[in-house]
């Protein structure tokens, strides 16, 4: 799925405008490349009981990029056109989004390795997730956007997977990773192509 979506998404890179969406697509393709590399390593070297813990090394890299790219898309739909202007204008929001995402991941990781109880990790992680997506909804153009609703649902399901037994958890994580990390890149290509047709 990663290879197919990457090949499809690369066609969007040949289009130069709208620049902000093309830059966002490049970030999503980097996410897909990291995911692909991680899964190759995961399948070759890592035992089932260590898979969930190891995923966090992927997520610590990819989720900040995914949050920046989805926020950039929503801001584009609000009328923003410059990545540089977005970085200046929404610096505070981006910092808060990335910090709350970090808190969510740290809680999950510490719960997985047994430093804190798993249910405590669920509570902390859920609170951090709500904070993250509330900022995107309220300040970054997520309100009223159907893609925001879909992404929120998919990300929320990671919390459901977290409490499942190892085998079921990793199957669900695999499915959610494919959706969350590949769907948006394909969607961006569609948006870029549609904009150029118009």
Protein language model regions, located:
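Polytopic alpha-helical membrane-helix bundles and their juxtamembrane interface segments
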Residues: 1-58, 63-198
């Amino acid at each position: 799925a990663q290879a197919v979506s990457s090949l499809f998404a690369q066609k969007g890179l040949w289009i130069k405008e709208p620049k902000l969406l093309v830059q966002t697509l490049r970030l999503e393709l980097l996410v897909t490349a990291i995911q692909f590399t991680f899964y190759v390593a995961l399948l070759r070297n890592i035992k089932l009981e260590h898979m969930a813990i190891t995923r966090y090394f992927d997520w610590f890299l990819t989720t900040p990029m995914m949050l920046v790219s989805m926020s950039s898309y929503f801001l584009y739909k609000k009328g923003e056109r410059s990545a540089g202007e977005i970085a200046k204008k929404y610096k505070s929001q981006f910092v808060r989004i990335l910090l709350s995402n970090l808190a969510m991941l740290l809680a999950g990781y510490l719960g997985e390795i047994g430093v804190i109880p798993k249910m405590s990790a669920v509570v902390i992680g859920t609170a951090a997730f709500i904070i993250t997506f509330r900022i995107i909804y309220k300040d970054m153009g997520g309100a009223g956007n159907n893609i925001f609703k879909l992404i929120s649902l998919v990300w929320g399901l990671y919390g459901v997977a977290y409490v499942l037994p190892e085998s079921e958890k990793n199957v669900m994580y695999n499915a959610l990773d494919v959706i969350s990390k590949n769907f948006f890149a394909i969607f961006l290509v569609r948006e870029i192509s549609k904009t150029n047709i118009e």
